[in-house]
Amino acid sequence: CPACDLHHYPRISPAIITAIVKGNQILLARGVNFPNQKMFSVLAGFVEPGETLEECLRREVFEEVGIQVKHIRYFKSQSWPFPDSLMIGFTAQYDSGQISEDPSEILEARWFDADHLPLTPDKKVLAGELIDWFVRSQTRESC
């Protein structure tokens, strides 16, 4: 503000998004609020105050599908203007637990092989890039 010399910065809502890999499979889910109910995607969720990104990832994954993860690695980020979010992408490895969907958020969650994927987001968005990363990682391993 020029009158009081205060700087105002836009508020953004940080959110994690993660590709979870178990051996040669990726965990994908259909969300309750997905516009296309046939589409599966990676898990995502908003960071809570006082929480690190890694803590958020572990919490969101456990809340949404009931599993534990390990070996969390930063992938990349993407601005998501609606609702003023910054998506921070990660990859993670499955650690333990059985899939148990939170019905308020997840309709279905399953493990998929790279060559048997359902309908997924376009590679232009971070979710699609994470899934593409998984597919390419499996192609490299089979060479």
Q: For each predicted feature, which ranges?
A:
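N-terminal strand-loop-strand
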Residues: 2-41, 46-47, 68-69, 92-94
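The catalytic Nudix box helix
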Residues: 42-76, 90, 98
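Active-site-adjacent beta-strand/loop module that shapes the phosphate/pyrophosphate-binding cleft
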Residues: 78-101
